[in-house]
Curated annotation (Swiss-Prot):
Keyword Amino-acid biosynthesis: no
Sorted UniProt keywords: Nickel
Record family assignment: Belongs to the LarC family.
Pfam (any one): Ni_insertion
Organism in which the protein naturally occurs: Acaryochloris marina (strain MBIC 11017)
Source organism superkingdom: Bacteria
A Gene Ontology molecular function term of the record: lyase activity
InterPro entries per UniProt: Ni_insertion
Protein name: Putative nickel insertion protein
């Protein structure tokens, strides 16, 4: 069984609406506040949570009250601004759960790429208000923490309404959808429509969350629905201004226990790069969301020995992966292709060992457990903490899993 979240966005999506829906689903506010303290930004804002009504429907409303600075208020004007590298350092030093950390970094990097393209500069050089603001950090990191706490493994999103009109921003008055939102939509080819409401319905933060995390856009996938969380928007609209997150589970196919997915394969041959650089390239690619990276020895023109670099990634991280390849290698071009891959149904469980908790990845085929693998990062952290070999921790985790699974009757 795979835990799914479907974002239904009849009046759009914003970061505070995501937070509200997740809190409505039961995510502890204290959990979010604890991690915000670790981000060292808790002194910059106050999180206000309340139950409100939108067109007679009750939903959870979240307001990020910032420490004010002089100047007129505006929807896209924030008190605290940061560049992308500073935000990355905050996230990486906060000790977030690994998946929440990865999602948060991916969302901010995709938003930075979009803003960079809009303004014609490198993402790391963009000093832009929406990403650098404290409330964007709270919205994005809080959303990722909430999804991780709920155990969500796959996310989907409805088509998004375009909205209309204009909005005041740090760069002046902008047409809605604002340029960064359009850029994010274009990257994922998001289906959009006009619902007749001419307001800003999709914010850059909301668009970045949706385009980074959602596997696809459209109607909800087949699922067994367990809960619905309602997150309220700020405006009173002609429709209930509510984001609904459907939380449920999708069973593996009875026939095979596998599911197909679309991935993008990037390839390039290189014959003039210092071999020492490839380790750094691998790390940089995995940091921006690559699923797999590998190299092969090849013979190139003029009988030169070379390296074929292959990167497998999801469609939403193609741009970030290509940026790393162009920046960190000597290649002049990258081939891109779409492929289908079949993946076993997977599940993550936590097992207690003598050294501490370790996450275990379980894989199923024909609804039968076929593979059990302790997570590398958990084993490595315990090995370093207790001065043990990684192999010793790995074997202890496997042994603990099989012993405890026999007790509870797992097959």
């Amino acid at each position: 069984m795979t835990k799914l979240a479907y974002f239904e966005c009849p009046t759009g999506i914003a970061g505070d609406m995501c937070l509200g829906a997740l809190l409505d689903l039961g995510v502890p506010l204290s959990l979010l506040q604890d991690y915000f303290r670790r981000l060292d930004i808790e002194q910059e804002f106050e999180l206000q949570v309340s139950a409100v009504h939108r067109q007679s429907q009750q939903a959870t409303y979240v307001r990020v009250e910032l420490g004010a600075e002089p100047g007129p208020p505006g929807k896209h004007q924030h008190s605290h601004h940061r560049h992308l590298p500073e935000i990355e350092r905050l996230i990486l030093s906060a000790g977030l759960p690994h998946q929440a950390e990865r999602w948060s970094l991916d969302i901010f990097r995709n938003l930075a790429l979009a803003e960079g393209k809009v303004h014609g500069i490198e993402p790391n050089r963009v000093h832009f208000h929406e990403v650098g603001a404290t409330d964007a950090i709270v919205d994005i990191v809080g959303t990722c923490l909430g999804l991780h706490w709920l155990g969500v493994e796959e996310m989907f999103c409805s088509a998004l309404p375009t909205g209309g009109g204009t909005v005041k921003a740090a760069h002046g008055k902008l047409s809605v959808p604002v340029p960064a939102v359009l850029q994010l939509w274009q990257t994922r080819q998001v289906p959009v429509y006009d619902n007749g409401i001419h307001k800003e319905l999709v914010t850059p933060t909301g668009a970045a969350i949706a385009t980074t995390l959602a596997q696809s856009f459209g109607p909800p996938p087949p699922l067994s629905l367990h809960q619905i969380g309602l997150g309220a928007g700020t405006l009173d609209l002609s429709l209930p201004n509510i984001l609904r997150i459907w939380l449920g589970e999708s069973a593996a196919s009875p026939a095979s226990g596998t599911h197909p997915e679309t991935v993008t394969v990037l390839e390039t041959q290189i014959d003039d790069l210092n071999p020492q650089a490839f380790g750094y390239v691998f790390d940089a690619l995995f940091q921006v969301g690559a699923l797999d990276v590998f190299t092969q020895a090849v013979g190139m023109k003029k009988s030169r020995p070379g390296i074929l670099l292959t990167v497998i990634c999801r469609p939403e991280t193609v741009s970030a992966c290509e940026t790393v390849i162009f920046k960190e290698t000597s290649t002049l071009g990258i081939r891109r292709s779409q492929q289908q891959r079949t993946a076993l149904q997977r599940e993550i469980k936590t097992i207690d060992t003598a050294y501490g908790p370790v996450q275990i990845k379980l894989a199923y085929h024909d609804q039968q457990l076929v593979n059990v693998q302790p997570e590398y990062e958990d084993c490595a952290q315990i090995a370093q903490t207790h001065h043990l070999s990684w192999q010793q921790v790995y074997q202890a985790a496997l042994l603990a899993w099989y012993q405890q699974s026999e007790i509870i009757g797992v097959k």
